[in-house]
Amino acid sequence: MNLYFRDYHAGSRLALVRRVDAPASGNPPVLRSEEAGGYEQLRLARDAACFASDHAALAPVNREAWQQLADGDIITVNEEGLVHRLFSGRERAATVYLTGHCNSNCIMCPVSDEERRTSGGLADEAMMAYLQMLPAEVRHITVTGGEPTLRTALFLRTMRTIAVRFRQADVLLLTNGRSFSLQGFLQELLHLCPAHLCVAIPLHAPEAGLHDAITRAPGSFVQTNEGIGNLLAQGIAVELRVVVSRKNAAYLPELADFIVAHYPEVHVVNFIGLETRGNCARHLQALYLDAPAAFRAVQPAVLKLMEHGIDVQLYNFPLCAVAPGFWEICRRSITPEKIRYAPACGECAARPYCGGFFQTTLAMTKPHVQPIPRTALFMDNRDTQDAHASERSGREV
């Protein structure tokens, strides 16, 4: 969303969007403070906008983008008038972004070094206000960064607020897991923890040398594995994430063996295709595998994990790159505003079910696309039955 306000002088704001019909004067009606729940609101009409607290009038530069704002959106406006949407009022899923800073510097991270240095997230009290502005009926919350645990006090305060205010919500924490190698920190989280928490942690290789070469953080393999073990020992659900690149593709079967041996109780293992921006774009030649090659690399590891009763999913894999027997584990994992399709995708019968490509990946790599015919969607695929036979029998025991 490319939205900013012309000649903006109203200062940084965090606001709840309310769309209203414009009165005859062309100015939006005044919003009383009690209607705003004590928080700032941005009142939008067809041709006018203002903040509720001081009636500061605003002039949007791109009116088409302005119309993308929905009632119930939560936004920030910076000193220059640039608008960023934190929450979409059309959704019942929320993202809580604590910081861009990270104690790893993964070679394939889609965030650039500059973004990590400069993106600090909301101030503490603004974050608390944001959590209170979210609708109570939110059913999924993702807590993310950077490395969200680096803002230790805010992280713990955030998790406790979520635990109290959103008791029924599924909560996904994206972290490198290293902070949970510290028992004291883990106990602080457990003191008041969201009831439906899953912690998603990347594991890049079955041994320290390669894992640490990918994270570019010496000692991270040991800390991450200690964190995973500590979380599982406390009964916290753990999702392992494996980002597939040239660096680790040849070692994925060994990584599957490692997971089976050490973490058989893991909630799910997700194999993830690259997003070619940030560090990944900078090191593209050393990292990039096209989606068909990435699938060929993950297939033996997927089967091994399934044979041992471990759930597996594929993120960021277009369906045409994946054998039909594995379509059922592919997820539409790319956020809607980042999804793009190649011209050839228009001929594909599977497009409504396919997650497509990242915009940057499509632009930088020009991936080959093989449209799937309609008949392929309804075939009785014997390979599917063979590939998953042992996985099914293992679950039935």
Where are these regions (language model features)?
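N-terminal [4Fe-4S]-dependent radical SAM core
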Residues: 36, 46-95, 113, 325-332
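Core AdoMet radical
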Residues: 110-123, 136-151, 163-182, 193-225, ...
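Short Lys/Arg-enriched alpha/beta "domain-start" segment
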Residues: 1-40
